[in-house]
Amino acid sequence: MKTPEDCTGLADIREAIDRIDLDIVQALGRRMDYVKAASRFKASEAAIPAPERVAAMLPERARWAEENGLDAPFVEGLFAQIIHWYIAEQIKYWRQTRGAA
């Protein structure tokens, strides 16, 4: 993949963006593997949401955004959506693997 400075046209730019988007989707898949693995360590469904963990994660993601020149509120909101979706998926997975309804 070319650096942004080495791109000679929109085709190069779009190819790089598509590659980055694929990397993001693959990272989300790897994240799901860990989310499912975490369910092994949750004694009950009620332990899954872990609001204290979410409360600690979001400001850290906002800080990472700032350190990378991105809009912190946008990134924090994006991660809030990501995290809450994964929590819902982990609950479904926990129920499936524990035989719960």
UniProtKB/Swiss-Prot annotation:
Entry-linked Pfam families: CM_2 (PF01817)
SMART domains: CM_2
PROSITE patterns registered for this protein in UniProt: CHORISMATE_MUT_2
An example molecular function term from Gene Ontology annotations: carbon-oxygen lyase activity
Keyword Nucleotidyltransferase: no
Domain Chorismate mutase: 4-94
pH dependence (UniProt free text): Optimum pH is 6.8.
Catalytic activity: isochorismate = salicylate + pyruvate; chorismate = prephenate
Induction: Repressed by iron.
Presence of keyword Isomerase: yes
Keywords: Isomerase, Lyase
Biological processes annotated in GO: chorismate metabolic process; pyochelin biosynthetic process; salicylic acid biosynthetic process
Annotated residues for binding of substrate: R14, R31, K42, Q90
Disulfide bridge map: none
Regulation: Inhibited by endo-oxabicyclic diacid resembling to the conformation of the transition state.
Outcome recorded upon mutating A37I: Increases the rate constant for the mutase activity by a factor of 1000, and also increases the lyase catalytic efficiency by a factor of 6
Domain of life of the native organism: Bacteria
Protein name: Isochorismate pyruvate lyase
Species this chain originates from: Pseudomonas aeruginosa (strain ATCC 15692 / DSM 22644 / CIP 104116 / JCM 14847 / LMG 12228 / 1C / PRS 101 / PAO1)
Taxonomy of the source species: Bacteria, Pseudomonadati, Pseudomonadota, Gammaproteobacteria, Pseudomonadales
